């Protein structure tokens, strides 16, 4: 874990201290949990393509669009 310094206004520092005391945890724990809740935990898994498959759809564009727009 890396050490980070954060400057807090007096009223926010007092709120962190109060929350830590009420929950029986350290102020650092309250701050870590608050940051985690605000920015999320782990990175989201990478998303696949919209039409993820073994063959790129662009290779079949002519076949797939044959007759498109014709009546």
Curated annotation (Swiss-Prot):
The keyword Lipid biosynthesis does not apply. InterPro entries: CopG (IPR002145), Ribbon_hlx_hlx (IPR010985). Pfam families: RHH_1. Keywords: Toxin-antitoxin system. The keyword Translocase does not apply. GO terms for biological process: positive regulation of growth; regulation of DNA-templated transcription. Antitoxin component of a type II toxin-antitoxin (TA) system. Upon expression in M.smegmatis neutralizes the effect of cognate toxin VapC26. This is Antitoxin VapB26.
């Amino acid at each position: 874990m890396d050490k980070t310094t954060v400057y807090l206004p007096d009223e926010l520092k007092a709120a962190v201290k109060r929350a830590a005391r009420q929950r029986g945890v350290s102020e650092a724990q309250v701050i870590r949990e608050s940051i985690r809740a605000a920015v999320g935990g782990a990175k989201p898994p990478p998303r696949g393509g919209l039409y993820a498959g073994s063959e790129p759809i662009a290779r079949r564009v002519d076949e797939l669009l044959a007759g498109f727009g014709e009546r």
